[in-house]
Amino acid sequence: MSKVTVVGAGNVGATCANVLAFNEVADEVVMLDVKEGVSEGKAMDMMQTAQLLGFDTNIVGCTNDYEKTANSDVVVITSGIPRKPGMTREELIGVNAGIVKSVAQNILKYSPNAIIVVISNPMDTMTYLSLKALGLPKNRIIGMGGALDSSRFKYFLSQALGCNANEVEGMVIGGHGDTTMIPLTRFATYKGMPVSNFLSEEKLQEVAAATMVGGATLTKLLGTSAWYAPGAAGAFVVESIIHNQGKMVPCSVYLEGEYGESDICCGVPVILVKNGIEKIVELPLNEEEKAKFAASAAAVRKTNAALHEVGAL
């Protein structure tokens, strides 16, 4: 029996669990939250859609009961707080690092062989923290960010082309942040052909810029962070793993010399299989793209330094 746990039953976590259940990715989906009754209520609400939507996945909600997460194949961590007015970057990292570290350690007690997918922000840094705190092999700790950023990139490309998003291929690498992500316009295709055959360089740069502020744009419109696409992106990564699909998906993973970087988690294309990361795919970047990736990694590394400042590592 396949089992997935989603820690954090907020907007993103609940959406992720709902997509996993609807697509019958696993036989059982467990939602765990610290707030009494929230995950139980959302699980019951979702289960009451099963006959309407035609899925058989069992959804279980629990409040801080990690025993119910036992023997999970994949665990998705969405826990953490959003940055509040007046809160410094270090303060946010300090709070979320404590939450994510505690969650990861509790999960490992009951699911020692689980693959861990991190959605909590700052995502690259929380992925790095999880890897270092747990001491797991790098193939088992995966940050979701690149999958979400690439989906947004493909959306903006499809809007510019006037086509369906499924007709477009595109990828975003680098850090999961407004100034650190790198939409690879040179590699993007439409019906198998380079998008540069259809869009001007100016238009491609507009698409890249829209992608980079995609999350911020939604926050401005919604008054809070987005949840449908982040939750679905998390579920997409989980499905690729659970079903051993061998898909190439951009994810934040631990680098040991790939793309010229080491001791850092950053977004790069990887092949996802049942055991997590099968391999990191190294794209033939040009000099400009290499420079952007180096700058992105430097920014992520600066954020990682705060983990030591707050005593998380």
Predicted regions span which residues?
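Conserved N-terminal Rossmann-fold NAD(P) cofactor-binding segment
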Residues: 32-72, 301-310
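N-terminal Rossmann-fold NAD(P) dinucleotide-binding loop
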Residues: 13-14
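Extreme N-terminal starter segment of soluble prokaryotic enzymes
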Residues: 1-4
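C-terminal substrate-binding/catalytic lobe of Rossmann-fold NAD(P)-dependent dehydrogenases
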Residues: 134-140, 149-313
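Rossmann-like NAD(P)-binding element
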Residues: 52-114
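Rossmann-like NAD(P)(H) cofactor-binding subdomain of soluble oxidoreductases
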Residues: 88-154
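Glycine-rich Rossmann-fold phosphate-binding loop(s) that bind the pyrophosphate
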Residues: 9-10
